[in-house]
Structure formats: structure tokens, C-alpha cells
Design a protein with these regions (language model features):
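Glycine-enriched, solvent-exposed interface loops adjoining structured elements
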Residues: 1-135, 204-308
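Autoprocessing Asn-cyclization modules and mimics
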Residues: 55-67, 94-102, 131-204
């Protein structure tokens, strides 16, 4: 007999939840059952971001660097940056070069004497912020045009010393504050468009993930910051959605959801030990497969060779 000739098996959210409820010793019956299972699935996806590197969530990004600007937004939903380089002469075979840039801690960045020094960036500090926008905390005290690089607000008391603000639909980066005036403003950040804004427009803080480079990019050549990030897994969504998870992780996902669901249904507690064991085993199998397969070689540093 012939095989099906297809390899497209997948489950939508409704089928995933139904399977999980059956493993937990119950049945999917009500709309609330679906809602609570979807919530548990989203919580589990958040937990997966803490368990290791999920290779299917890798994405490459490129930022064109501006001379004199040292801080740049990274897309909201970024879990972490995995690799990063400074690229010069981009998109031309004879000139493109990717140069090393080292990630440093906040402690190391804080000890740099002159953070405004300009040259080719060789170090970067990544701030893993949550991407949330606060409620309005102040307002503009005067109208600004699309090209203004100084912005006056009614009160800067609640603003961080440097960072991003949202005015109407525009994200603006400011370098420092003096009094109630924001200076060294970079307009139209985070894929927004620089625009004019009227006096009394609301100002909110944006906690955007960001990289700060040192030295600050100079104008000797055109630089790009090229990075590979691990993004968040997409939310579970509605009942007809398929999950943002490769087929190899489907057994793990269903086993995990069954374990989460069993904690919330009558009679589910007695199944928890076996469901937890099944989830842990399924996770380990999937995680062991979800890894780099490239060869690796360890070479001792020259300073240690020959030392007794």
C-alpha cells in the first residue's frame, strides 16, 4: 500500500486544547474552557523563552547607523540578541565587511570615561526592556516641527535621564535633559515618521528594547548594526489559528498544556505527576533536537601553551 505522500499534519488551537483536556482526564465543553486553556498556552510560551534558545524564533535585523547617535531601538518582542556585527560597505561584494562588536554589561558601560567619543563602534550594551508604553506623564509646552531636535515639556520630573518618548504616533529618542527641555533628539524612531506636534500634546515613556554603541558612530564611513535576535513566540490567538511552533515541538506543547490544564480542573491533581513527567521528557527530547549541528573546535589561548 502507498503512503499518503504528504507531510503537512498540523493542529489548530481548538484541536490542541481538545487533546490537552483529554490527556488531563476531562473534555473541552465550554467557552471558558477554551479561554483558560488559551491563557495557559500563552503562559507556557512565555516560560519557554526562559528555558533556552528556541531556534525557530531567530530573526536577522539591520539598523543603519547615524553619525553622532549611539542608541537605537530593537523590535519589541525581542527576548535577546544572539549575535551582532558592525557592517561596512554593505551590499557590495568587493567592500562589504562584518566586524566584531563585543557585548558588554551595564557595569562596563558605566565605567567608559567618554561615552560621546566618535569612531567605529566596537562595544554594545543591550537593554532588555519590556516594550511597554506608559500612560501620558507630561505634555509638550510648545509646538514642535518635524525637524526640531530640542523639545520642551511642561515637566520633565518623571522622565528618565535619556530614552524614548511617544508623542502622538511618533517615537522620539532624547539624549539628555536640562530643566524641562529634552536635547539631542532623534526624530522618527522605531519605524515611525517625524511629524509636527502641537503644544499640549501628550507625552508618554516607551520602554523599547535598545542597543547603545561605543564609540558613537562617526562619519568616516557608512555603518550598519547587523544582529540576530530571538523573538517571542506568537500568541495562541483564536481557535482556528495554528501555533508558532514547529511540528517537532507539537508533542511537547500538548504535553505541557495538559499539565497546565490538569492543575485547574476537578480531579486533575492526581494526574499531575505523570503529566509533569511526560512534559519534562517531551521538552527534553525537543530541546535536544533544536540545536546547532555545526562542528565545534576548542583551541587554548597562546598565553597558556607551555606554561607549567
Amino acid at each position: 500500500m502507498a503512503t499518503s505522500g504528504t507531510a503537512t499534519f498540523n493542529l489548530d488551537l481548538s484541536e490542541i486544547v481538545e487533546e490537552a483536556f483529554e490527556r488531563a482526564g476531562s473534555e473541552l465543553r465550554t467557552g471558558y474552557d477554551m479561554r483558560t486553556a488559551r491563557r495557559s498556552l500563552n503562559i507556557m510560551f512565555a516560560d519557554w523563552a526562559n528555558r533556552g534558545v528556541n531556534m525557530w524564533t531567530f530573526e536577522q535585523g539591520t539598523i543603519n547607523l547615524v553619525p553622532g547617535l549611539n542608541t537605537y531601538p530593537i523590535p519589541t518582542g525581542t527576548v535577546d540578541l544572539l549575535e551582532h556585527v558592525i557592517r561596512t560597505g554593505s551590499n557590495t561584494a568587493s567592500t562589504q565587511a562584518d566586524l566584531t562588536i563585543t557585548r558588554i554589561s551595564i557595569s562596563t558601560y558605566a565605567t567608559i570615561p567618554n561615552k560621546l567619543q566618535q569612531a567605529r563602534p566596537i562595544q554594545m550594551w543591550f537593554q532588555r526592556l519590556d516594550g511597554q508604553t506608559t500612560a501620558s506623564i507630561t505634555t509638550l509646552s510648545a509646538t514642535i516641527t518635524a525637524t526640531d531636535t530640542t523639545i520642551s515639556v511642561t515637566s520633565a520630573t518623571s522622565l528618565p535621564a535619556t530614552g524614548y518618548i511617544l508623542v502622538d504616533a511618533e517615537t522620539i529618542y532624547y539624549g539628555y535633559i536640562s530643566g524641562n527641555t529634552l536635547y539631542s533628539c532623534a526624530r522618527g524612531q522605531n519605524n515611525t515618521t517625524a511629524a509636527s506636534h502641537s503644544s499640549a500634546a501628550a507625552v508618554a515613556i516607551q520602554n523599547i528594547p535598545r542597543v547603545t554603541l561605543w564609540p558613537t558612530p562617526d562619519n568616516s564611513t557608512t555603518y550598519q548594526f547587523v544582529y540576530w535576535r530571538m523573538r517571542r513566540i506568537d500568541d495562541a490567538g483564536g481557535g482556528v489559528n495554528t501555533m508558532d511552533v514547529p511540528f517537532r515541538f507539537m508533542p511537547c506543547m500538548i504535553a505541557g498544556l495538559a499539565y497546565y490544564v490538569a492543575q485547574k480542573i476537578p480531579g486533575g491533581m492526581e494526574r499531575l505527576p505523570i503529566l509533569k513527567a511526560q512534559y519534562d521528557e517531551a521538552w527534553q527530547l525537543a530541546a535536544d533536537e533544536d540545536r546547532e549541528k555545526a562542528a565545534i573546535r576548542f583551541v587554548p589561548r597562546q598565553m597558556f601553551i607551555g606554561n607549567s
